[in-house]
Amino acid sequence: MANIKAGKERTKIFGRGSHECLLCGRKQGLVRRYNIFFCRQCFREWAPKMGFKKLN
């Protein structure tokens, strides 16, 4: 019983789990370039609306 932490858990301030998607909250597959912080699924949906174009 001595191993139980008292108080709230520490939040992650760096690394892969520290950021999340601004739209859905997912932490995996983030597009962090240009400070977008969208997951790849949300980025595919919103990229044309933001002005990104798919090249061949």
UniProtKB/Swiss-Prot annotation:
Cofactor: Zn(2+)
UniProt binding sites for Zn(2+): 21, 24, 39, 42
InterPro entries: Ribosomal_uS14, Ribosomal_uS14_arc, RIbosomal_uS14_euk_arc, Ribosomal_uS14_sf
GO cellular component: cytosolic small ribosomal subunit
GO function term, MF aspect, one: rRNA binding
Source taxon at top rank: Archaea
Keyword list, A-Z: Metal-binding, Ribonucleoprotein, Ribosomal protein, RNA-binding, rRNA-binding, Zinc
Transmembrane segments: none
Gene Ontology biological-process annotations: cytoplasmic translation
Cofactor note: Binds 1 zinc ion per subunit.
UniProt-listed NCBIfam families: PRK05766.1 (NF004424)
Purpose of the protein: Binds 16S rRNA, required for the assembly of 30S particles.
Family, similarity comment: Belongs to the universal ribosomal protein uS14 family. Zinc-binding uS14 subfamily.
Subunit structure as annotated in this protein's UniProt entry: Part of the 30S ribosomal subunit.
Protein name as catalogued: Small ribosomal subunit protein uS14
